[in-house]
Amino acid sequence: MAVLKPKNIYYMLSYAYRVLTQGEFKNLDSEEFDNIHNLFAEIIRLGISNQIKRGLIREYEEHTDEIKTIRGKICVKYSLRGLSGKGDTITCSFDEYTLNTSMNQVLKTTMYYLIKSDEVSQTRKNKLKNLMKYFSDVELINPHLIKWSTFRYHRNNAAYKMLMNLCYLILSGMILSDTAGTHKLAEFIDDQKMHALYEKFILEYYRREFPELKAAKKEIAWDLSDADEMMISLLPKMITDITLTWENKALIIDAKYYGHSVAESVHSDKKIYLSSNLYQIQAYVKNMDKERTGNVEGMLLYAKTDDEAFNESSGVFGGNKISVRTLDLSGDWKDIDSKLKTIAKEFKESASA
């Protein structure tokens, strides 16, 4: 995979999470970053600083402790045991309003690893250290034990959502463990996590820049003429990454972020497109275009890799146009922006023809 410019990751994040285009985050657009660690450190610093001004969230947590005055519920079993001893304490279970919440633990742990990283500048480390004092009552946690799927967002903690997503990208996509069980940040983000960001970026880009194309993820029903319930239940769901719609036509974009976008042919020495990707996009197109009108197009949009043999191309498969395109995330942002705009404009022209 070609090396991504930190600034391009910022632009991708700013589309994926619109809050990064607002308030103090807007200044990031004019700032240069020599690596992604400094970029993340600054976004995290700004986000947490803003949250501190609003107030870090607190939650009620149940505690059980031996205390001298009754508080909450008396734990009879343990209290009776205590009476046989000194008898000056009683065991109670009570709720405590605390800063030591799961989300605050994630914020503190993320700052901790950014501060430990050799890639983060000392100036940014010092700024993060200044924020750590607000988390003195918050525990550090093992990044691998964070239950990300359990986080729930509501009106009071909605501002945490972007921060948690960014912390997930850092702690889940960059943390490396050594044989001694210690952790450190990797040089690059894990491809799987970058794939998810790449996909979300393209979807949100078209939603913002071309709202008339109604960019959305869509579930496609299998075009079955006769199938029993067992067959239907065993079929995988077909959900597109991005579907653009204009007039009576649709363009299905399958976003791909891989280390390699071509493979060696088993029949010759030449490079070929990955067959599984072509089969997938063709299945999406054919099942959406049930009437065989040719009004549904498909596109594989790869993040450009270092594969020199990769060529963009397009063809008509059984009446439907299928294209293979690349997006060079290591280049200038204006070129990325121009490429995405060209894809949208060409689709609109094709649909209007």
Map each language-model feature to its residues.
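Terminal, charged accessory segments of proteins
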Residues: 1-183, 353
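Glycine- and acidic
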Residues: 25-26, 149, 184-189, 261-270
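Short amphipathic alpha-helical patches
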Residues: 67-72, 133-137, 190-194, 229-230, ...
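Contiguous, non-catalytic segments that form substrate-binding/exosite surfaces or channel walls
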Residues: 165, 175-180, 185-186, 190, ...
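Catalytic core segments in nucleotide and nucleic-acid processing enzymes
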Residues: 191-353
